[in-house]
């Protein structure tokens, strides 16, 4: 399982939100490229970037920062989400050296767009499903739909999606542990690999994901925990690599 540091971008700075609320943000660095360097030097094997302004505006806003990080680390897999709602945007990021684009809101509102994107950019598309009580949320989590996460995930199985990033909104940024039972249920219900996100606080939460014994869970995204020092990236990755269960 991969430990994937998150860099959330707002107005060019690296921030963390609590439960997706833009007004409840903490600035951790005004130099996201240096922050990326810190996690790379700490041994991370993939980075998770989110354009928070983009998620709310429906188009990239912090694209220059993303490009700068991708250029600095051409051999590091980078995934970017937030405001990706057109093939042009995907093409822009792929040309900039980004490995994966995460389609969120558009995947819920227009599921056929995912198939289109996978066809145009095979192996590059991840679907981001953010949920509250098992139902999918969209538009920077401002709206909760009547669509169930597992039902929607199954729709994408035939499209060639590389992974699903599953985030439990109630847990995100709260450092109270991630929703292991639902993450496991999602991983077992679909053939698409799942990346867990939201709520990871310490090594115990990483162990809980591994103890779930769901081979489909291939990664865990962590944000606030690594910024506030309750989780060490290198230690957590070593723990995953050596886990015997």
Swiss-Prot record:
Main location: cytoplasm
Record key words, sorted: Amino-acid biosynthesis, Cytoplasm, Histidine biosynthesis, Isomerase
Transmembrane annotation, as ranges: none
Enzymatic reactions: 1-(5-phospho-beta-D-ribosyl)-5-[(5-phospho-beta-D-ribosylamino)methylideneamino]imidazole-4-carboxamide = 5-[(5-phospho-1-deoxy-D-ribulos-1-ylimino)methylamino]-1-(5-phospho-beta-D-ribosyl)imidazole-4-carboxamide
Subcellular location: Cytoplasm
Annotated GO biological process: L-histidine biosynthetic process; L-tryptophan biosynthetic process
NCBIfam families assigned: 1-(5-phosphoribosyl)-5-[(5-phosphoribosylamino)methylideneamino]imidazole-4-carboxamide isomerase
Protein name per UniProt: 1-(5-phosphoribosyl)-5-[(5-phosphoribosylamino)methylideneamino] imidazole-4-carboxamide isomerase
Organism of this sequence: Pseudomonas putida (strain ATCC 47054 / DSM 6125 / CFBP 8728 / NCIMB 11950 / KT2440)
């Amino acid at each position: 399982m991969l430990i994937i540091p998150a860099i959330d971008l707002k107005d060019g700075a690296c921030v963390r939100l609590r439960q997706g609320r833009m007004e409840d943000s903490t600035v951790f660095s005004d130099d996201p490229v240096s922050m990326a360097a810190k996690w790379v030097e700490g041994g991370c094997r993939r980075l998770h970037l989110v354009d928070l302004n983009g998620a709310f505006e429906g188009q990239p806003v912090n694209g220059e920062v993303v490009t700068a990080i991708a250029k600095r680390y051409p051999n590091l897999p980078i995934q970017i989400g937030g405001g990706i709602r057109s093939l042009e945007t995907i093409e822009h990021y792929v040309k900039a050296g980004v490995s994966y684009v995460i389609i969120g809101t558009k995947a819920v509102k227009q599921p056929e767009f995912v198939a289109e994107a996978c066809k145009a950019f095979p192996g590059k598309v991840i679907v981001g499903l953010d949920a509250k009580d098992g139902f999918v949320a969209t538009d920077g989590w401002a709206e909760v739909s009547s669509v169930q996460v597992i039902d929607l995930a199954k729709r994408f199985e035939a499209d060639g999606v590389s992974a699903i990033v599953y985030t439990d909104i109630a847990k995100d940024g709260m450092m109270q542990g991630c929703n292991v039972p639902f993450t496991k249920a999602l991983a077992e219900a679909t053939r698409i690999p799942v990346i867990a996100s939201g709520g990871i606080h310490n090594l115990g939460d990483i162990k809980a994901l591994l103890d779930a014994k769901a081979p489909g869970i291939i990664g865990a995204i962590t944000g606030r925990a690594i910024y506030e020092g309750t989780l060490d990236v290198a230690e957590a990755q070593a723990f995953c690599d050596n886990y015997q269960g």
